[in-house]
Structure formats: structure tokens, C-alpha cells
Amino acid sequence: MKEEVFIELGFEKTIVTAEESGSPDDWYYYSLDIGNLSLLTSASDEIVDGNWYCYFAESDDFKMDNEADLRDLVRILRIAFKIDVR
């Protein structure tokens, strides 16, 4: 998935400095809270060939890398939690 998808869906970018993380470089990720669930992306320093993935903060077992599926999931969660559907 491309980074632009997360921006379009309203994910918030969080920058983590090298000083904060102890990594040699700054990096960032995106997050989206819907109801009591949080979707997180892979970290920018883990991206291979521009392909990002998304997962639930609450579960390491869930990993999504298909744009259409993510769009559907976000839409369904917004409906379920009665949040405006974009």
C-alpha cells in the first residue's frame, strides 16, 4: 500500500526522533483511532519498495496490505462506531 492511502483516510502522522528512539535516524508512522480501536502503520524505516502495511495496535496477528480492504475496514468501523463516513 502507498503512504498516500493513510493520509487520505485521515491517519495522523507521528514523527519519532532518533533521540527518542535510540535509532540512528528519525522515522515516522501513521495512526488512526476509531472508537476504542487503533490502527497503526509500519514504521517508515521498515518500508520496502514503498509498500506500507497496517495493523491493529491491539493485535500483532492482524496485518493488512491491501488498499481496498483497508478502505472497507475503515468505512465499516466508522459506521459501527457511528462516526462520519468519509
Predicted segments with their positions:
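Amphipathic alpha-helical segments
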Residues: 1-15
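Ampiphathic alpha-helical segments that act as solvent-exposed interaction surfaces
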Residues: 6, 59-86
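Compositionally biased, intrinsically disordered low-complexity segments
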Residues: 8-10, 19, 37, 50-51, ...
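Residue-level marker of intrinsically disordered, low-complexity segments enriched
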Residues: 13-14, 32, 46, 74-77, ...
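Acidic, low-complexity, intrinsically disordered interaction modules
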Residues: 18-68
